């Protein structure tokens, strides 16, 4: 391959006198190189050879600059350059190197790319490719563009992206910091050619979305080695700042050199050898430590510590850094890049980012996502630092609430993926999360800058709205805490952690400012939705009752304003409201009270200015009670007296009816407690009526009880829809019996009476003991008839009204996934809460947060000043603002303070205050001061570990104080808790439906602090509250039997069992219960009741769906079934059942079970299969397991058994016909040969051959398709292949051929059936109906003779 590549490279052309000359076969040579690269193996020999010759710089770039280059040559040259310049990781198919050889290959590919990059620092090259792009996009109309040229342009744009994606050469020699690197020189050539303007033009075209993502990558890669600060600052300011920075660096270098020189001690001859240190013991306690090297400072001598083996973290778990590769470019490069960034913002930034957004995130382009967030961060930072406010409108696509939301979503997703995935993929998501976090940080800073410094009010309002959004919504407030708790140093870099700390610092400063200015008092928070209990529907009190308290002055004013309108209504100039009913039929009050309530209703209508309704109600009342409305009565019948009626209405308006209003409210409150109107006349029967009714019903009752007349058995004494206790159910059953007796429905009454006795056969015998006589039953029924059950009737009415609500759910019913889907209540809701800044800061005092802050603080000397300030500010908030310094009593933090103190030891006070570490030094001083003021032996031990809330509390108040305070908190009922208890009690009392939950359960589960049921009950009794029937111990277990009708379930279960237990028991019970109760009962509830009744439920197996057949095959099956059914007595005539009949004639072979199932679906009767004999299975195993050893051991002992078996086998044989005699003889000869083979010596190969022979015999005997030629040929091939011995193979082939020939020439079924001698043995076998003459399984040493006249049948 190397020779071919070298030959092709030398055949391209040569560079002479500043001009590149192409060889005649240059085009074909490039094609050959492309083919070599395409056929290159995993060692990438061709690519590496091209890189060694630096083909891009020596040949391809000069070739492209040639003016006489044809289109085809240009196209193929660009193709080869794109292929050679693709990233090394793409060449290795995106997989990182796995071993040393692959790493060596990878670095060689990278080095070749770096050498090739310098070739693109020629502006003429970019000018040449710019002409091609301009010719396509600018000079050619959209409709006239050629698809082939478009492909060339795509390759050019991709080539530019590959060129700028080549990693910089770190070993490149640079004399000064601002000397142009290879990357900078390529940028200069790129910008001088003007191709950047062409790319901006393409990015601004909405039709060219395919190029936008690649152009975005190009701009991001150009700017990746620059910082926004360098480009945003003007050149004069940069020069001054750079001069100062350079002087400062030189000063530091000199100081460090001086310090190092002064720390070196001069060598003295007396310290040239080994010596001991006084006061410092060695390994042995009796000897001093011996030193063999010079010591700079004896106090810092840690000789023993250096010898300890340090614990090393695995390589894949170590914290890592991501190099940004940024450098300070020359003023020329910075100026050109600054102008380019401004042009991007002004011409195409919004369009480019909007069109790229969908492509980048929808199509999941990993590298482009990083470049997308980098460009957002760079541009936003550039606009903020350059203070060019006129550019804010040009970046509107990447700012605002929507930008925050999109960034938040992507950042959360990246962090989740980074912490859940593993390996390179996890680090890839971590890298994307780093750039997304940087963009989020710049969004916060830019909006804050606009809010503080923008000149236009609209821009300030826009920024304020976005900032208020991110501080109000919980997702943004919890984002820093969420990320830092998820942080893992193995997949997220230290760069990410530093960016996160800075972002948190800026966000908290923003929140703190909003709190101090009063702009942030309420925030939104997601809370779990507790399913609200339904409030009672209070008696619908007249809304006009609010006018009952009107003063006399107001009434006089009202009448003066409205009497004219009332008079017009009375004169019928204005229509009154017709059909008014002054009587409330639901109120059980006397007529006098109804008249008063009607007048009150008229008064309220007048006072609420409902004059048409008031006049209509007045006329309706006067028609009902003329004696109570006497004024104007004489005129009413002939001509109405409007003036008299007006006076009476005025009196009603001004009358004092407060007492009547109280009576009305009392009557309405008792309305729901009244008896059921349907049974009202029966419930209020007096003693005389009851005596008369009993005398008339005694004879009929006696006849029913004596079984002379039938009783009703279809009635149930209990309404199972009511959620009540068993005792109350018994009362309701007695009321049902009483109402049936009083309604003269005697059969139903007796049926209810007997059913109730079966349901409650307890010791109390409320409905009589089992086996009592007729006279005793009559006496008990008379007692039930005459009993006073008015209170029971009211309770029943209340319970029935409570059960009428269709939305009410059963609290005892567990969740059933098979029920119909109900409307789901959202599990979370957003509500406003008071925002406490200290509570928010307290969330950062978590150990998982603090350990990473201390981790970054260890590198305080390398950190930027801004990062150190952010770290110290957070620790200061926790230690001093929250007054939790104990949280920071940690040895790892104290070691940082020790290093800082060492740094400040040799500095004067003036230098200390000007130092960038002064804030850290001051914070450490005050924190250690607090620590040593409380220092004890226990505190020294506690400083070794991170501390949670419990540990901090116990350090402050003593060990064990945490538990004691919690216990004291549990025992004490605070005033707020008592108020909450009262409110919950009142809430329970006003509930319309209590879902079977008593007051103690309700309060126990809704109280803000945990209190036991017993303590809640004691507190309610202490307050003098009624427990409303609740017991101190929950009695849900005792109510288990009252959930469903046990008697009916047992009866239905017995019926289902007697019917053969067909179908699903739960489905049967569910249908019965739905019909009986009129409500849906869940499967889980029925299963629970069955378990309680000790009824074993087995879920029926689901019937498998029918196998999928073709429509034509199913139609053929139907015709065969009809054909079989048309034959009279088909089973005896044909000798086969319908299954075998169909299988023989079906055009396509199908399994027997599938044919049976399809026939069953068509209504055919399928004969049952008999179980196979266990003895046959045993013989099968014996046949496989016996070997020559067994036969030898059995010699002499089993001769009688062998003789009997031979007799049996002879009786089983079928005598062959004369025409089959020859085949029969051949079969017997083959059998004898096999028997001779079996008599070979007992060797290992003989045993294996015998075992294989027996397996082959079994396979040939159990074949279901013995009449198929193909299968026979297949079996002929299988048998000899299974044997190793050549003689055995030959014998087996002879035997198999004779056996199959005998089977195939045996004929088919005849009309007279099959003649077969029955077996005389007692072995079990399958029934004759199951034996198929067509595909019958033939056992060894058996033949079946069949006639050939199959068609005649």
UniProtKB/Swiss-Prot annotation:
One of its GO terms (molecular function) is DNA binding. GO terms for biological process: cell division; DNA repair; DNA replication checkpoint signaling; embryo development ending in birth or egg hatching; meiotic cell cycle; meiotic sister chromatid cohesion; mitotic sister chromatid cohesion; regulation of sister chromatid cohesion. The keyword Protein transport does not apply. One of its GO terms (cellular component) is nucleus. Residues 798-825, 1150-1291, 1306-1335 are annotated as: Disordered. It comes from the Eukaryota. Residues 1150-1160, 1168-1182, 1227-1239 have a biased composition (Basic and acidic residues). It is found in: Nucleus. The keyword Nucleus applies. Plays an important role in chromosome cohesion during both mitosis and meiosis. In prophase of meiosis, it is involved in the formation of the synaptonemal complex (SC) and specifically, in the diplotene and diakinesis phases of prophase, it stabilizes the association of homologous chromosomes during synapsis and sister chromatid cohesion. It regulates cohesin subunits to promote meiotic chromosome cohesion and localizes non-SMC (structural maintenance of chromosome) cohesin subunits to chromatin prior to or during pre-meiotic S phase. Belongs to the timeless family. Associates with the cohesin complex. Interacts with smc-1, smc-3, scc-1 and scc-3. This is Protein timeless homolog. It comes from Caenorhabditis elegans. The gene is tim-1.
């Amino acid at each position: 391959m190397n020779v071919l590549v070298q030959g092709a490279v030398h055949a391209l052309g040569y560079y002479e006198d500043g001009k590149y000359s192409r060889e005649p076969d240059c085009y074909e040579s490039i094609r050959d190189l492309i083919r070599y690269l395409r056929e290159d193996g995993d060692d990438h020999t061709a690519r590496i050879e091209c890189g060694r010759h630096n083909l891009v710089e020596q040949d391809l770039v000069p070739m492209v600059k040639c003016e006489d280059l044809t289109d085809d040559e240009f196209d193929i040259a660009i193709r080869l350059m794109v292929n050679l310049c693709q990233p090394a990781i793409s060449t290795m198919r995106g997989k990182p190197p796995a071993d040393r050889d692959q790493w060596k290959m990878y670095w060689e590919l990278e080095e070749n790319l770096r050498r090739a990059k310098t070739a693109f620092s020629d502006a003429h090259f970019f000018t040449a490719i710019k002409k091609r792009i301009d010719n396509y996009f600018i000079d050619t109309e959209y409709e006239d563009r050629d698809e082939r040229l478009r492909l060339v342009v795509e390759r050019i744009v991709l080539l530019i992206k590959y060129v700028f994606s080549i990693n910089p050469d770190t070993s490149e020699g640079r004399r000064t910091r601002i000397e142009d690197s290879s990357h900078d020189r390529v940028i200069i050539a790129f910008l001088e050619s003007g191709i950047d303007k062409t790319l901006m033009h393409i990015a601004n075209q909405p039709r060219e979305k395919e190029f936008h993502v690649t152009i975005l990558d190009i701009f991001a890669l150009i700017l990746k080695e620059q910082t926004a600060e360098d480009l945003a600052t003007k050149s004069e300011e940069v020069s001054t700042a750079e001069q100062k920075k350079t002087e400062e660096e030189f000063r530091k270098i000199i100081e460090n050199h001086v310090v190092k020189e002064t720390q070196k001690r001069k060598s003295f001859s007396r310290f040239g050898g080994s010596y001991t240190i006084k006061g410092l013991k060695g390994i042995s306690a009796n000897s001093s430590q011996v030193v063999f090297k010079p010591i700079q400072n004896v106090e810092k001598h840690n000789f023993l510590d250096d010898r300890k083996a340090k614990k090393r973290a695995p390589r894949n778990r170590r914290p890592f850094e991501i190099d940004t590769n940024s450098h300070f470019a020359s003023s020329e490069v910075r100026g050109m890049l600054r102008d380019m960034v401004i042009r991007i913002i002004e011409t195409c930034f919004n369009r480019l980012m909007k069109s790229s957004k969908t492509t980048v995130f929808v199509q999941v382009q990993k590298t482009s996502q990083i470049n997308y967030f980098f460009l957002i961060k760079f541009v936003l930072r550039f606009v903020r630092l350059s203070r060019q406010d006129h550019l804010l409108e040009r970046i509107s696509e990447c700012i605002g609430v929507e930008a925050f939301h999109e960034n938040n979503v992507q950042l959360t997703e990246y962090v989740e993926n980074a912490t859940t995935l593993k390996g390179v993929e996890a680090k890839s998501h971590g890298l994307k999360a780093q750039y997304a976090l940087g963009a989020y940080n710049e969004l916060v800073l830019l909006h804050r800058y606009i809010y503080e410094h923008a000149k236009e009010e609209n821009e300030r309002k826009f920024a304020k709205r976005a900032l208020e959004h991110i501080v109000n919504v919980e997702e943004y407030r919890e984002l820093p805490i969420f990320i830092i708790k998820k942080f893992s140093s193995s997949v997220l870099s230290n760069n990410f952690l530093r960016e996160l700390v800075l972002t948190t610092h800026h966000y908290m400063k923003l929140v703190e400012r909003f709190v101090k200015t009063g702009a942030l008092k309420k925030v939104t928070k997601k809370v779990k939705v507790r399913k609200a209990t339904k409030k009672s529907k209070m008696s619908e009190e007249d809304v006009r009752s609010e006018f009952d308290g009107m003063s006399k002055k107001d009434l006089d004013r009202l009448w003066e304003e409205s009497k004219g309108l009332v008079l017009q209504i009375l004169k019928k100039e204005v229509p009154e409201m017709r059909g008014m009913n002054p009587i409330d039929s639901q109120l059980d009050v006397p007529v006098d009270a109804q008249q008063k309530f009607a007048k009150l209703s008229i008064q309220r209508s007048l006072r609420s200015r409902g004059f048409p309704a008031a006049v209509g109600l007045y006329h309706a009342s006067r028609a009902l009670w003329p004696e109570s409305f006497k004024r104007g009565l004489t005129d009413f019948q002939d001509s109405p007296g409007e003036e008299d009626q007006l006076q009476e209405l005025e009196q009603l308006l001004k009358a004092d009816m407060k007492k009547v209003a109280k009576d009305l409210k009392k009557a309405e409150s008792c309305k729901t407690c009244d008896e059921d109107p349907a049974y009202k006349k029966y419930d209020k029967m007096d003693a005389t009526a009851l005596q008369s009714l009993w005398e008339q019903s005694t004879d009929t009752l006696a006849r029913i009880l004596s079984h002379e007349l039938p009783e009703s058995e279809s009635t149930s004494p209990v309404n199972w829809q009511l959620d009540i206790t068993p005792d109350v159910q018994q009362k309701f059953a007695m009321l049902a019996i009483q109402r049936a007796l009083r309604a003269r429905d005697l059969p139903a009454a007796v049926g209810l009476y007997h059913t109730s006795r079966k349901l409650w056969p307890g010791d109390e015998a409320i409905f009589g003991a089992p086996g009592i006589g007729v006279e005793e039953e009559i006496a008990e029924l008379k007692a039930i008839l005459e009993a006073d059950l008015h209170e029971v009737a009211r309770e029943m009415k209340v319970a029935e009204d409570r059960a009428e609500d269709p939305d009410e759910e059963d609290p005892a019913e567990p969740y059933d996934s098979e029920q119909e889907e109900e409307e789901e209540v959202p599990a979370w809701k957003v509500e406003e809460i008071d925002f406490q800044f200290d509570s928010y800061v307290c969330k950062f005092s978590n150990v998982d947060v603090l350990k990473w802050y201390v981790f970054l603080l260890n590198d305080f000397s390398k950190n930027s000043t801004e990062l150190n300030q952010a770290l110290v500010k957070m620790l200061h908030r926790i230690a001093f603002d929250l007054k939790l310094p104990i949280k920071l009593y940690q040895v790892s933090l104290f070691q940082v303070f020790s290093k800082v103190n060492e740094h400040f030891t040799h500095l004067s006070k003036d230098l200390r205050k000007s130092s960038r570490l002064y804030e850290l030094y001051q914070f450490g001083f005050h924190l250690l001061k607090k620590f040593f003021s409380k220092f004890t032996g226990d505190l020294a031990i506690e400083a070794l570990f991170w501390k949670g809330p419990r540990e901090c509390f116990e350090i402050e108040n003593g060990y064990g104080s945490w538990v004691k305070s919690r216990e004291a908190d549990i025992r004490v009922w605070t005033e707020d808790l008592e108020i909450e208890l009262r409110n919950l009690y009142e809430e329970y009392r006003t509930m319309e439906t209590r879902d079977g939950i008593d007051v103690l359960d309700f309060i126990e589960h809704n109280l803000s602090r945990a209190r036991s049921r017993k303590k809640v009950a004691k507190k309610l009794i202490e307050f003098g509250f009624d427990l409303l029937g609740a017991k101190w111990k929950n009695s849900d277990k005792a109510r288990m039997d009252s959930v469903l009708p046990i008697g009916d379930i047992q009866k239905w279960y017995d019926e289902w069992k007697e019917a053969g237990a067909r179908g699903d028991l739960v489905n049967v019970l569910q249908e019965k219960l739905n019909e009986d109760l009129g409500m849906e009962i869940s499967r889980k509830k029925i299963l629970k009741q069955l378990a309680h009744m000790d009824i074993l439920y087995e879920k029926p197996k689901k019937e498998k769906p029918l196998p999928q057949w073709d429509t034509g095959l199913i139609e053929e099956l139907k015709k065969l079934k009809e054909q079989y059914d048309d034959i009279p007595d088909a089973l005896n005539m044909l000798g086969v059942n319908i299954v075998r009949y169909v299988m023989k004639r079906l055009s396509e072979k199908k399994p027997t079970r599938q044919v049976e199932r399809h026939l069953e679906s068509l209504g055919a009767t399928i004969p049952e299969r008999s179980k196979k004999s266990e003895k046959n299975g045993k013989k099968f195993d014996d046949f496989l397991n016996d070997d020559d050893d067994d036969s030898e051991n059995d010699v002499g002992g089993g001769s009688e058994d062998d003789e009997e078996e031979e007799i049996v086998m002879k009786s089983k044989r079928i005598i062959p016909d004369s025409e089959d005699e020859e085949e029969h003889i051949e079969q017997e000869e083959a059998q004898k040969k096999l028997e001779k083979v079996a008599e070979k010596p007992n060797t290992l190969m003989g045993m294996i051959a015998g075992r294989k022979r027996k397996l082959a015999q079994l396979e040939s005997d159990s074949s279901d398709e013995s009449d198929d030629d193909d299968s026979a040929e297949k079996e002929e091939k299988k048998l000899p292949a299974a044997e190793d011995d050549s003689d055995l193979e030959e014998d087996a082939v002879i035997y198999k051929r004779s056996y199959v020939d005998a089977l195939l020439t045996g004929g088919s079924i005849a009309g007279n059936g099959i003649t077969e001698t029955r077996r005389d043995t007692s072995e079990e076998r399958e029934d004759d109906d199951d034996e198929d003459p067509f595909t019958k399984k033939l056992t060894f040493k058996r033949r079946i003779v069949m006639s050939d006249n199959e068609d005649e049948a």
